[in-house]
């Protein structure tokens, strides 16, 4: 199934983070913090401005992004994979090589 976000929404696949501390202790899933990085897998058509124009989003599919710890509270499962849906304004930065 394909997910197509509306307007200024973005769908992000959360990056897998190491669940081991610097000292080598493996953390159980409940104790590990969820990563605040991910890859954009789908973007909406853009933000609708007050005058009716649509402004394209600054992020694109494939971008690696950083978001806040409480961003993307709308987690959904698609084909067994958990994806985050958030507004573009919740994305803090794009990671570049």
UniProtKB/Swiss-Prot annotation:
It is found in: Cytoplasm. Keywords: Chaperone, Cytoplasm. The keyword Chaperone applies. One of its GO terms (molecular function) is unfolded protein binding. Disulfide bonds: none annotated. Pfam families: Cpn10. One of its GO terms (cellular component) is cytoplasm. Together with the chaperonin GroEL, plays an essential role in assisting protein folding. The GroEL-GroES system forms a nano-cage that allows encapsulation of the non-native substrate proteins and provides a physical environment optimized to promote and accelerate protein folding. GroES binds to the apical surface of the GroEL ring, thereby capping the opening of the GroEL channel. HAMAP family: CH10. Belongs to the GroES chaperonin family. This is Co-chaperonin GroES. The lineage of its organism: Bacteria, Pseudomonadati, Pseudomonadota, Gammaproteobacteria, Pseudomonadales. The gene is groES.
């Amino acid at each position: 199934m394909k997910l197509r976000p509306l307007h200024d929404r973005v769908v992000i696949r959360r990056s897998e983070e190491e669940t081991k501390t610097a000292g080598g202790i493996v953390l159980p899933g409940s104790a590990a913090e969820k990563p605040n990085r991910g890859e954009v897998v789908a973007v909406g058509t853009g933000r609708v401005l007050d005058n009716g124009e649509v402004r394209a989003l600054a992020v694109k599919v494939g971008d690696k992004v950083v978001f806040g710890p409480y961003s993307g509270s709308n987690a959904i499962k698609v084909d067994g994979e958990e994806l985050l849906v958030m507004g573009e304004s919740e994305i803090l930065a794009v990671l570049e090589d």
